[in-house]
Design a protein with these regions (language model features):
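N-terminal, positively charged nucleic-acid-binding surface of large information/translation enzymes
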Residues: 1-40
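Short, glycine/charge-rich beta-strand/loop segments that flank catalytic centers
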Residues: 3-7, 29-32, 42-57, 75-84
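Short secondary-structure transition/capping motifs
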Residues: 17, 21-25, 46-53, 166
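Alpha-helical recognition segments enriched in aromatics with Gly/Pro capping
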Residues: 34, 55-189
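Short glycine-enriched loop/turn motifs at secondary-structure junctions
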Residues: 41-42, 159
Length: 190
């Protein structure tokens, strides 16, 4: 299991609670691990945190840009969804049947409204890392994909996650993995 310890919702929740992001993520990581222990689930051999892999994420994103699977615009880097022929296969969603603006705000800087963010600029009040595209932070889908790619042999056997993550999260992980290593992220998705 990996730990997302930086994303927009975490930044917002930490600001609303007036506590450091690290304190908030530690609290929920501890709760998660306690719940898993209560259920008699063995602890993972490794439990990577997204912030420990930002350099890997920057290299991963740069690789996707070099392969013409992603593009930069105004400090944002987007994955170009039409570049992945199998997009929508896991969730049984046709690209041309998706309604622009139904899930995320319509953006005039995207080539295609289904394109998703790999890197986004950070304001002075938000955490950020130096990158070829400016100070910013990785997108959530990229965090999970890169931590998996660094720590596991791709494709790994089983990828699990909540039904609520099927689209767009798992679909976007698959698209990035296929673009990066020409392989699905895992053999089985549950």
């Amino acid at each position: 299991s990996n730990i997302t310890d930086i994303d927009d919702k975490i930044i917002e929740a930490a600001n609303e609670s007036n506590i450091p992001i690290s304190e908030l993520t530690k609290k929920y990581t501890d709760i998660y691990n306690a719940d898993m222990s209560y259920l008699n689930v063995l602890p993972p051999d490794i439990q990577p945190k997204a912030t420990e892999y930002v350099e890997d994420m920057i290299n991963f994103i740069d690789k996707l840009i070099q392969k013409d699977k992603a593009y930069e615009k105004d400090g944002h880097v987007f994955f170009h969804v039409p570049s992945h022929e199998g997009y929508g296969k896991l969730s049984n969603r046709e690209i041309d049947q998706q309604l622009a603006g139904s899930r995320v705000q319509v953006s005039d800087i995207k080539k295609n409204q289904q394109d998703f963010v790999l890197w986004k600029p950070s304001s002075k009040s938000q955490p950020g890392w130096d990158s070829p595209w400016g100070i910013g932070r990785p997108g959530w889908h990229t965090e999970c994909c890169v931590m998996s790619e660094v720590n596991l042999k791709i494709p790994f056997d089983i990828h699990g996650g909540g039904q609520d993550l099927l689209f767009p999260h798992h679909e976007n992980e698959i698209a990035q993995s296929c673009a990066s290593v020409n392989s699905d992220l895992s053999l089985i998705h549950i």
